[in-house]
Amino acid sequence: MKYPPSLVGLIRELSRLPGIGPKSAQRLAFYLFEQPREDIERLAGAILEAKRDLHTCPVCFNITDAERCDVCSDPTRDQSVICVVEEPGDVIAIERSGEYRGLYHVLHGALSPMNGVGPDRLQIRPLLPRVQDGMEVILATGTTVEGDATALYLQRLLEPLGAVVSRIAYGLPVGGALEYADEVTLGRALSGRRRVSEPASPPPPRRNDEEQDGAPARPPSH
């Protein structure tokens, strides 16, 4: 038995959603078919309204319906620290922990060469002008292979800018995504973050060859 074309199309579109395979898409399609028409229209309206009203914050690239997101617009936030995350959902998860009062930067993904996701596909370039000498940057990407690779790439970019770079780690399972962690675990992960670099120190003053060999420097000739 073949499904009607409209049902096939619905299953196909649902299966394009993250985490939804063909079987789950089929179950969702049958579920939606059984719902009252007004419920389906309300769902469709909510999707269209969100698509119309939401956009990314021009500063941190979190999702907002205002000119700038709530965090970037809040003058009481700690301006000396930026927490870098993969997705907007990670911001919500960290905010629920109540352990962080700094700023954010959302990359909208992680480096994944196998899937064709390079640095140019992420919001990495806009992060660099935000980082000032002596600021702390918390790399709160996931503990997946892609998240670790992204953190290492960012560390190498940020160290020459004089940033104190730290990595969220404690309490997060390997391969875990931040948005699925509970508030207590995230709070401990933020509190237990470890520094992976320090601000670059200026090079020592150069000495002439004789001083370097241990011989006293010659007095200046007249």
Curated annotation (Swiss-Prot):
Presence of the UniProt keyword Ribonucleoprotein in the record: no
Family, per entry: Belongs to the RecR family.
Residue span of region Disordered: 189-222
Zinc finger (C4-type): 57-72
Gene Ontology terms, MF aspect: DNA binding; zinc ion binding
UniProt xrefs under Gene3D superfamilies: 3.30.60.80, 3.40.1360.10, 6.10.250.240, RecR Domain 1
Start and end residues of each Toprim domain: 80-173
Keywords recorded for this protein, A-Z: DNA damage, DNA recombination, DNA repair, Metal-binding, Zinc, Zinc-finger
Protein role: May play a role in DNA repair. It seems to be involved in an RecBC-independent recombinational process of DNA repair. It may act with RecF and RecO.
Superkingdom: Bacteria
CDD domains found in the cross-reference section: TOPRIM_recR (cd01025)
Keyword presence, DNA damage: yes
Any Pfam family matching the protein: Toprim_4
Biological process, per Gene Ontology: DNA recombination; DNA repair
Name the UniProt record assigns to this protein: Recombination protein RecR
